[in-house]
Amino acid sequence: MRLALVRQRYSAYGGAERFIERALGALGEQGVAVTVIARTWIGDPGTVVRCDPFHIGNVWRDWGFARAVCREVARRPFDFVQSHERIACCDIYRAGDGVHAQWLRNRRAILGPLARVGLGLNPYHRYVLAAERRLFASPRLRAVICNSRMVRDEIRAHFGTPEAKLHVIYNGIDLEAFHPRLRKVHRPAMRQKLGIPQQAPLHLHVGVGF
């Protein structure tokens, strides 16, 4: 089987990147030929196809990448295309960034009148909304991987995607690297390093966008 994984840019801290890196190893062990299609990527160059068309600005950047990827997919004999970007030429989409339409709705709820107007006129948001609609309306789309029930419900509410296409698969965790027994090893030293009293309540938010 020949599988393409699509991600525009590599980030050392990205959840999608962790997902792809784990998939590359696991699928490779099963004899699946995996190709990463990306603008930039860190890894074995033999498994990466670079799509890096010229662009100015974020609308042109995302539109140009999506167009280049779909051209690449059309000329290569992939059995499946799994994308982490909003492109209409994929078989499986991982909705790791949630639903942009819902994010905008939540954002508008906390903004003032002028800021809401600016949000609505922003060309990038308008592009992403259009790309999102094309993705979920695509007859090629077979399945959507949702990393939470909330995302699943939002996709169903905004786009009417059939329940059978929506699959909740939570992010994997390395239970050796993240295990309660390691608390005794790292907790006191890390609190001391950050200047946090040993008994002070501490809330940690893991993710981006905070």
Model feature map: region roles:
Residues 150, 172:
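Carbohydrate-associated surface elements
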Residues 197-210:
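Conserved donor-binding/catalytic core segment of Leloir-type glycosyltransferases
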